[in-house]
Swiss-Prot record:
Protein's name according to its UniProt entry: Aspartate carbamoyltransferase catalytic subunit
SUPFAM superfamilies recorded: Aspartate/ornithine carbamoyltransferase
EC number assigned by the record: 2.1.3.2
Residues where carbamoyl phosphate binds: R55, T56, R105, H144, Q147, G272, P273
Role of this protein: Catalyzes the condensation of carbamoyl phosphate and aspartate to form carbamoyl aspartate and inorganic phosphate, the committed step in the de novo pyrimidine nucleotide biosynthesis pathway.
Name of a matching Pfam family: OTCace
UniProt GO molecular function: amino acid binding; aspartate carbamoyltransferase activity
Enzyme superclass (EC): transferase
GO BP field: 'de novo' pyrimidine nucleobase biosynthetic process; 'de novo' UMP biosynthetic process; amino acid metabolic process
């Protein structure tokens, strides 16, 4: 695996191996007073975020540091990007500065794929076996593969297996890269996926996705093994998608009443940040069925696994 750009690059075996690797890292860190492994000593990981992030950026940073990598955070607002530098020049500059891996978040769909093409082209032209590994940390409304992987890891830990489970994804499907990645990864892992949203928040072509579409949340909750709530991405909207926040919450928010419709074993998830009181009630977000903080913890271990596979390979042992 040279890059991680899309969940569609992973078959069931590859995805399962990453989940297994993440759990091995979790076990390797248990009982250690200092969370530090020498696995990536001497490697340089750079995070390049053109959009704001807390969970993804921090967890990649922690993942790299726990494996002894040198981690450098590049903020678009404080770099030469703010002076008009192109994405290509920024990527090549960071590579020339010694990056072994670039973790990229960008508002344009396909940005990480383009950087990977530039890096692979540079490697061919220079006669090298490869350039830096590229990880897609979110590209516009397209994909967020590591989020889908950590969600799958959380589901596996809570439910025992993903095969045959029903996962209901609720909310702003239209603008959600998390929804897209989850739909395709969960399908690969054998889950049944149901999308619940108002018609205005469904993308064109959603009928071709491996998921069933519904507009009635109450009808879908009793048979769900897991519910993944999505934030309404107001920053990507210009109005007119639904009448009001209150009406949206009434129709598509996960309230205490709706929580009671779920089976006792069902898991409630959210990729964050949560809009408490809109798509999810505080009492639900803080309930025993909620796995929101477990998702964050799993994000570190999963991203350790991704960096390990990209920079070391599957045959090496975890130190």
């Amino acid at each position: 695996m040279r890059h991680l750009l899309s969940v569609t690059d992973l078959d069931r075996t590859a995805a399962t191996e990453l989940l297994d690797e993440a759990e091995r890292f979790e076990q390797a860190l248990l009982g250690r007073e200092v969370h530090k492994l020498p696995t990536l000593r001497g490697r340089t990981v750079m995070t390049v975020f053109y959009e704001n992030s807390t969970r993804t950026r921090v967890s990649f940073e922690v993942a790299g540091k726990w494996m002894s990598a040198d981690v450098i955070n590049v903020s678009a607002s404080s770099s030469s990007v703010s002076k008009g530098e192109s994405l290509r020049d920024t990527a090549l500059t960071l590579h020339a500065a010694g990056a072994d891996a670039l973790i990229v978040r960008h508002p344009a769909s396909g940005a990480a794929h383009q950087i990977a093409r530039w890096m692979d082209g540079w490697a061919r032209e220079s006669g090298r076996s490869h350039g830096p590994a590229i990880v897609n940390a979110g590209d516009g409304m397209h994909e967020h593969p590591t989020q889908a992987l950590l969600d799958a890891l959380t589901l596996r830990q809570r439910l025992g297996d993903i095969e045959g489970k029903r996962v209901v994804i609720v909310g702003d499907i239209l603008h959600s890269r998390v929804a897209r990645s989850n739909v395709f990864l969960l399908h690969t892992l054998g889950a049944e996926v149901v999308l619940v949203a108002p018609r205005t928040l469904l993308p064109v072509g959603v009928q071709s996705w491996p998921a069933r579409v519904s507009h009635h949340l109450d009808a879908e909750l009793p048979g769900a093994d897991a519910v993944l709530m999505l934030r309404v991405q107001a920053e990507r909207m210009n109005g007119g998608f639904f009448p009001s926040a209150r009406e949206y919450s009434v129709n598509y928010g996960l309230s205490e009443r709706r929580l009671a419709l779920l089976a006792e074993h069902a898991v409630v998830m959210h990729p964050g940040p949560m809009l408490r009181g809109m798509e999810i009630a505080s009492a639900v977000a803080d309930s025993p069925q909620a796995a929101v903080l477990q998702q964050v913890t799993n994000g570190v271990h999963l991203r350790m696994a991704v960096l390990f596979r990209l920079l070391v390979g599957a045959q090496e042992a975890i130190a």
